[in-house]
Amino acid sequence: MRRIALIAALAALTATPAFAQNFTGNWACRDATTAKAGILTIYGEVYGFASTTANDGSSGTGTITGYQDGVSFNDGNLRTGKAIQAGRIIPDPTYGTAIQLETAEAIVMLCTPR
């Protein structure tokens, strides 16, 4: 009976997608001109963004939904101020991984680990 319970528990754990392991932490973001845009911090289901521009409306906090290949921005200043909907994990030749921040129309920022 214990073996069946152990096997069932292990199967349930391996079937669930990994959450927040690959995108959690601090990310240095650059805009389309490669100028420094700010710092993105993701922990759990929340994010914070600090813009390099004073009084920028995109600075602030909000909530996210994590996926295997990135995050969805549910609310907060990045969503309302910059219309950013998603952050996708992509391979990066220098840092290994990066997050590209996207609106519905375009990629607007690239963030690399700090």
Where do the protein language model's features map onto the residues?
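Positively charged n-region of N-terminal signal peptides that target proteins for export
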Residues: 1-4
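Bacterial N-terminal signal peptides
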Residues: 7-15
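Conserved, charge-rich beta-strand/loop surface module that forms ligand/interface-binding patches
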Residues: 8, 73-74
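Sec/Tat signal peptide C-region and signal peptidase I cleavage site
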Residues: 16-20
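Short, solvent-exposed loop/hinge segments that bridge or flank secondary-structure elements
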Residues: 22-53, 75-87, 105-106, 110
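Acidic surface patches and DE-rich sequence motifs
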Residues: 31, 54, 67, 73, ...
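Short, solvent-exposed coil/turn segments at beta-strand boundaries
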Residues: 40-50, 67-70, 88-98, 114
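Edge beta-strand at a domain terminus
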Residues: 59-67, 96-114
